[in-house]
From Swiss-Prot:
GO terms for molecular function: ATP binding; pantetheine-phosphate adenylyltransferase activity. Pathway: Cofactor biosynthesis; coenzyme A biosynthesis; CoA from (R)-pantothenate: step 4/5. Its cofactor is Mg(2+). This is Phosphopantetheine adenylyltransferase. The keyword Nucleus does not apply. The lineage of its organism: Bacteria, Pseudomonadati, Thermodesulfobacteriota, Desulfobacteria, Desulfobacterales. It is found in: Cytoplasm. The record marks 18 as: Transition state stabilizer. Pfam families: CTP_transf_like (PF01467). Its EC number is 2.7.7.3. PANTHER family: PHOSPHOPANTETHEINE ADENYLYLTRANSFERASE.
């Protein structure tokens, strides 16, 4: 029986931390479905199509990975895909309480689906999509935190949408 897990998230954008969890998860599972959550109540930087495109591109060399989208309950999606596990990455203790509550609710909704937590590698422990977007917005260097393709797309999106705010010159003016 193939061991399939669902790795769900918004992936807005995908980070090197996400890819770290995915690669390490493949040591535990035969196949991982990276499932992009479609939440109409949330505002995203990238469209679903853009997120699918980025994920497909950055995972093309990672075997046994499938990119998909879902809405609704994650455990229902897992059952539909015949997956028996949900893979979750945790950066810090602060993630644990929320993730633990989600895991308990998912377990209550479907006892056949287990949640597996992986700690993010130390190199990525501070990395989140939100922090990366905020840094990029103000001209911060995000090189190495996201794949190069994603870095270019963030830069372009920030400039094309007017979200980019150039750093201010901190030199005192004479006068």
């Amino acid at each position: 029986m193939e061991r399939t897990a669902i790795y769900a998230g918004s992936f807005d954008p995908v980070t090197n931390g996400h890819l770290d969890i995915l690669k390490r998860g493949l040591k535990l599972f035969d196949r991982i479905i990276v499932a992009i959550l479609i939440n109409p109540n949330k505002q995203y930087l990238f469209s679903v199509e853009e997120r699918i495109s980025m994920l497909e591109e950055v995972t093309k060399e990672i075997p046994n990975t499938e990119i998909d989208t879902f809405s609704g309950l994650l455990v229902d999606y897992a059952e539909q895909k015949q997956a028996h596990a949900i893979l979750r990455g945790m950066r810090a203790v602060s993630d644990f309480e929320y993730e633990f509550q989600l895991a308990l609710m998912n377990r209550r909704l479907n006892r056949e689906v287990q949640t597996v937590f992986l700690m993010t590698g130390l190199r990525w422990i501070f990395t989140s999509s939100s922090i990366i977007k905020e840094a990029a917005r103000f001209g911060g260097n995000i090189h190495g935190m996201v794949p190069e393709l994603v870095e270019r797309r963030i830069d372009k999106k920030m400039k094309d949408t007017g979200l980019y705010i150039p750093p201010k010159n901190n030199k005192k003016q004479k006068g």
